[in-house]
Amino acid sequence: MSQLSFSSFDTSLMVRDAQGRYLLATADQILEAARQAIEHKMRRGASFSSPATVKEYLRAKLAGFEHEVFAVLFLDTRHRLIEYAEMFRGTIDSASVYPRELVKEALRLNAAAVIVSHNHPSGNPEPSAADRALTQRLREALALVDVRTLDHVIVAGSSTTSFAERGLI
């Protein structure tokens, strides 16, 4: 396999415009293409069988936002995707999350498990004390209706932090 230099890699990322001409792809076009590819791969019913798959999917979904977004993967008993939902939006450094709304949606979808996630636009993937407290509140609320909280993933640009991998959940 031949190696590509950065400059040759740049020129290989092309898009076709409305007139059929090939132009260099912008960063936004590349990110959108990556999101679409991952979305296509993880359609409803796809199984989240590894933490790497979960993190790749959530990174593609949440990395580009300039404000906090709290999202949930609702899963069935075999950890297959029922629905991805961006449930709450906030400011550049916080988002209000309401456990009651998350429980209602889990029940509506008949979810057996969830993976919660949010982004840190600051670029720092470390969980705050508020993130840890929220995770515990959500786990307790969801447990009352027999819905398991499998993980809480923080996305910060290309970095992610998994509560499950750190033993925090």
Where do the model's predicted regions map?
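Long amphipathic N-terminal alpha/beta scaffold segment
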Residues: 25-87
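Active-site-proximal loop/helix of nucleotide/amide-processing enzymes and allied scaffolds
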Residues: 2-32, 36, 53-56, 78, ...
